[in-house]
Design a protein with these regions (language model features):
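N-terminal pilin/flagellin-like segments and related low-complexity appendage regions
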Residues: 41, 54-244, 250-284, 289, ...
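Aliphatic-rich helix starts adjacent to a transmembrane/signal segment
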Residues: 2-67, 303
Length: 311
């Protein structure tokens, strides 16, 4: 007697194939979702490491600004003033050497990848600080300096020449540094103000700086950008520097939740990132801000000292 052989019916086979397809699709979706989560976490890590840690490196030197200045009340005419606004912040012996050079803080000092909500391009700021070195050390470019010299550091945005195919301009926050001796008439690096410096924070679309200022009675405090402070006739004194950065991830994300027209608030400035039609991959961006109190600026307490090699 022949044994009957049972097999799949056509309907059972179709159901099995359908279930297999569903399971495979679910596994594929989990894999894609996991990859996106990994990319998002990596992008966040990029911003945390380059942004927050880099900002900490910068603020360490900014806190030294105004060290051994002619007056602890930091103003735009303070000799050896920690935030360099005008030629009067340099000693008389240096003023001819710095005249006409890019060695001053400015609200429109360098390039950016942003515009305001009305579609007008906005430049990034430039911050120049100086302080007297109390000990031998290294400046923001990693170059050694000697105790007793005045150290000058310039923070600005520039393009990363080693970048690949990236959206807009691959900008980063760089620092260029030099020094001068007390009573000297030139920087140790005569090209200071035109060099490329050392990149500190990669992929910064916008750099903005505000100054916390007050009058001599310390009853009016406000924030001004550098150019408005420079043009203010009341010669307010500077108490703190507020820094704002729009930092982006190094790599793009496969996410549709990131809008190209998103507005970012960087201190008192609303900005929108310039769009690049050649790049379809979105990037994660984050605003990083920090206020640095200038410990050597006296916070409104005048304590004039004799400036060696001054006016």
């Amino acid at each position: 007697m022949k044994k009957s052989i049972a097999g799949f019916t056509l309907i059972e086979l179709m159901i099995a194939l359908a279930l297999g397809t569903i399971v495979t699709a679910a596994a594929l979706m989990l894999f894609i979702s996991g990859q996106r989560d990994i990319a998002l976490q990596q992008a966040s890590a990029d911003i945390q490491s380059s942004g927050n840690f880099g900002l900490g490196f910068i603020t360490k030197d900014i806190r030294l600004a105004n060290l051994d200045a002619a007056n602890t009340l930091l103003k735009k005419d303070t000799i050896y003033g920690g935030v360099v606004i005008a030629t009067s912040n340099y000693p008389q012996s240096m003023q001819q050497a710095v005249s006409g050079k890019n060695v001053f803080s400015s609200s429109i000092g360098s390039t950016s990848n942003v515009k305001d909500p009305s579609n007008t391009s906005i430049n990034s700021a430039q911050l120049v600080i100086q302080f007297k070195a109390q000990n031998d050390g290294f400046n923001c470019e990693g170059k050694a300096y000697t105790a007793g010299n005045y150290i000058v550091e310039r923070y600005f945005l520039r393009e990363d020449t080693g970048a690949g195919n990236e959206p807009n301009k691959p900008l980063g926050l760089a620092c260029e540094a030099t020094s001068y001796v007390d009573g000297g008439n030139a920087f140790n690096d005569t090209n200071f103000g035109s060099g490329s410096g050392q990149l500190i924070i990669r992929r910064v679309d916008y750099f903005h700086v505000l100054l916390n200022v007050s009058n001599d009675n310390n009853d009016v405090f406000k924030y001004l950008d550098i150019n408005n402070y420079a043009s203010d006739s009341t010669n307010l004194h500077i108490n703190a520097v507020q820094i704002g950065l729009l930092v982006r991830s190094n790599d793009g994300l496969g996410s549709n939740n990131l809008r190209a027209d998103q507005q970012y608030q960087v201190l008192n400035q609303s900005v929108v990132v310039n769009t690049d039609s050649n790049i379809k991959t979105p990037f994660l961006r984050k605003v990083i801000q920090q206020t640095v109190a200038l410990r050597n600026a006296g916070l409104g307490i005048s304590d004039t000292v004799t400036a060696a090699g001054g006016q």
